[in-house]
Amino acid sequence: IYKDPISLFKQTNFSKTIWWKLKVNISGYQNQTEDKLVTEIFKNRIFRLLYPNIYQYNHKFQRILIQLYEDGYVCWINLDGLIIEKYELRKTENFKNERFFIKDQLNSILKWIKDQADLTNEYLWGGTLGPNYDCSGLIQTAFLKHRIFIPRDSYQIKSFCKHLFYFKDSYKALRPGDLLFFGNKEKCDHIGIYKGDGLYFHSSGRDFGRNGIGLDTLKHSNDKISLHYKSKLISAGRVVRSYRWDRTIR
């Protein structure tokens, strides 16, 4: 039986400590009014309400501000079409073999990305549901599909990963599944995943990239797109843990 989200929030006094499960795929937006997509959110993901609170709910509003459980991401979502249910968090246990679990999933993650690349796709800012992705949406979803939670945006993933090295000329220490970070001294603004043999997958835009998921090289090349991204390489990182709400600094 469908229950209006606002009536559910009222029952819990708009608590920020109650968790909710999404029953539909939805879009996440940058602010309360504009249609600036920042992410797409899978059905069955978990969130908590940040806005409105019990003193504000009488105001007319079409969006609510939420924080997602699996990555701590904050965005606005539309109330229209929203279907949710209350969710009881289970006590999480320390996963002693987490690093080995992640390592075992990397070949499957790379195969999943290759399969996505074979589909008709184009670059979509905020895309995570597929077949259209942005750079970090592709990487986050690839890991999410394999029960590994990492942050949403490329600069957040960079901080979350185990730092391997800053780029000079060598890529020989990279392993398949390592992540590559691109940008400038101020900020990382692009991400790819290393396939092996100097090659990496990434979803790149229209202006300097392939307008979708492509394979580029770190080796010497005359390809303009590979050269552009090689010039922007910052560092490499390795996913060695899964984001956990109860232990990850937010």
Task: Annotate each language-model stretch with its function.
Residues 14, 41, 173-174:
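Short, well-ordered loop/turn sites that connect or cap secondary structure elements
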Residues 151-221:
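...with weaker cross-activation on analogous glycine-rich loops/strands in unrelated enzymes
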Residues 22, 49, 181-182:
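A generic structural signal for residues embedded in beta-strands
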